[in-house]
Regions:
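Aromatic-lined substrate-binding rim segments of carbohydrate-active enzymes
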Residues: 57-125, 129-130, 204-209
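Conserved residues at the C-terminal ends of beta-strands
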Residues: 46-48, 75, 178, 305
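Glycine-rich, histidine-containing beta strand-loop boundary motifs that form or position
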Residues: 75-76, 112-116, 218-220, 301-306, ...
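N-terminal carbohydrate-binding accessory modules
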Residues: 19-71, 101
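Substrate-binding/catalytic cleft of secreted carbohydrate-active enzymes
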Residues: 112, 116-149, 155-300
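Carbohydrate-binding surfaces of carbohydrate-active enzymes
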Residues: 147-161, 168-177, 182-183, 187-190, ...
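Aromatic- and acidic-residue-enriched carbohydrate-binding clefts of CAZyme catalytic domains
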Residues: 38, 75-87, 92, 120-145, ...
Length: 443
């Protein structure tokens, strides 16, 4: 009986949060964002869990708080979690729930951007490679097969993070429906606007059916709201520096009222191989930040901290002159927090502006320690092509794609042996990656 009394006393002394998190409310109403009934602007920074080792997540969140921000936004990368069909991975660097929990512990609200298409200069825009092997599949449209798999993805995502919505006591306050869909609508004029809207509505409904119940929003260029906006979701503008134009276009698609938000406030820009790295100055970024603050415009720095495209995750852009523009392994983005996690001149400039509008900004945390790596001497080499004879070939008259070979990432060796001398020009049409060509062993 005494043991039972001790147990009851122990239970009584435990904080309530040990068993149940306190629910909160986040609403979009009367032209404002409201957190627990109080008008609350959003000062957010984009940071992707997949581009930062999990050991550094907390430090980066602390850097954001010390910059004056109150929220973090992140995409969810479907192909980061389901690299093989039906095999899900949410461990280690892929532990999205842990990422969100740590953000909440550090006093940040969380904005979730699950796509399913995310762009983000990420491989296949976040789609798993194996989707292309499914018969009848047409991605990013009102297609039965595609929607079958997006439903499975969204339901699995909810299983991981649904309990972390503010309505359940977590830090997630908003969720984005699709991603910059207006750009896709503008490019795919072969598909009717009605069909585009039907697809967009079904993605939103899948999010609702899965159990996501926090406010929804869309993000597009301000000139693309016609194709990208969807009913009962706040339209936000990407890269819009003209505040009058921002308010005009949001009013048009949101019952003539705000709140007004720039969901992608570009702090820098992406970098392509063999091109100069884009640079923007700190002073102009700080000035635009203050313009938003003075005019009650919420914002999300894209990116506040870019990180790294590990492995084969970096994507590419398309350009008519150069066909393909592959992105770098580095996703530094010339952002306020460098790829290494250090404060930059942009960071300091923005922090000084934010101090005028945000009370009690904490001190900037110390930089993470670095290590010295001694010189590494390589004394052995191996000819990769020399081992090709040990691999059983797949024969055919025409080369197969990676997907047809059931290979999501890495390298494929395509070879052709000619029995007689030939001459002419080698043309490779439709190449979607980097190719290294050898003729008789010569590069």
């Amino acid at each position: 009986m005494r043991k039972l009394s001790y147990l009851l006393l122990f239970l009584a002394l435990l904080p309530l949060g040990t068993f149940a998190q306190k629910k909160s409310s986040f609403e979009i109403k009367n032209g404002d964002f409201y957190l627990n009934g109080k008008a609350t602007p959003i000062y957010s920074g984009e940071m992707h869990y997949s581009r930062i080792p999990h050991q550094y997540w907390r430090h980066r969140f602390q850097m954001m708080k010390a910059m004056g921000l109150n929220a973090v936004a992140t995409y969810v990368f479907w192909n980061w979690h389901e690299q093989e069909q039906g095999k899900w991975d949410f461990e280690g660097d892929k532990d999205l729930a842990e990422y969100i929990k740590i953000a909440g512990e550090e006093g940040l609200m969380v904005i979730l951007r699950p796509g399913p298409y995310v762009c983000a200069e990420w491989e296949f825009g976040g789609y798993p490679w194996w989707l292309q092997n499914i018969e009848g599949m047409e991605i990013r449209r009102d297609n039965e097969q595609f929607l079958k798999y997006t439903k499975l993805y969204i339901e699995r995502l909810f299983k991981e993070v649904g309990h972390l919505q503010c309505t359940k006591g977590g830090p997630i306050i908003m969720i984005q429906c699709e991603n910059e869909f207006g750009s896709y609508v503008a490019q795919r004029t072969d598909i009717s606007l009605e069909q585009h809207r039907a697809y967009n509505a079904k993605i939103k409904q899948q999010l609702i059916d899965a159990g996501f119940d926090v406010p929804m929003f869309t993000s597009d260029g301000s000139w693309l709201f016609e194709g990208g906006s969807t009913p009962n979701a706040l339209p936000t503008a990407n890269g819009e520096s003209n505040i009058e134009n921002l308010k005009r276009v949001v009013n048009k698609y949101h019952n003539n009222q705000g709140p007004y938000m720039v969901a992608e406030f570009y702090s820098g820009w992406l970098s392509h191989w063999a091109e100069p790295s884009p640079q923007t100055d700190a002073s102009s970024l700080a000035r635009q930040t203050e313009e938003y603050l003075k005019n009650d415009v919420s914002f999300n720095f894209y990116m506040v901290h870019g990180g790294t495209n590990f492995g084969f995750t970096s994507g590419a852009n398309y350009d008519k002159k150069r066909d393909i523009q592959p992105d770098l392994t580095s996703y530094d983005y010339n952002a306020p927090i460098s790829e290494a996690g250090w404060a930059t001149a942009k960071y300091d400039s923005i922090r000084n502006v934010m101090k005028k509008y945000v009370k009690d900004i904490p001190a900037v945390p110390s930089a993470m320690p670095v290590i010295e790596i001694p010189s590494i001497k390589l004394d052995k080499v191996a000819d990769v092509l020399g081992y090709s004879s040990l691999i059983k070939p797949i024969l055919g008259d025409n080369p197969k794609t990676f997907e047809e070979l059931n290979q999501g990432y890495g390298y494929v060796l395509y070879s052709r042996h000619f029995k007689h001398p030939i001459s002419g020009t080698l043309a490779i049409n439709g190449l979607r990656d980097y190719a290294v060509i050898y003729i008789d062993g010569e590069k």
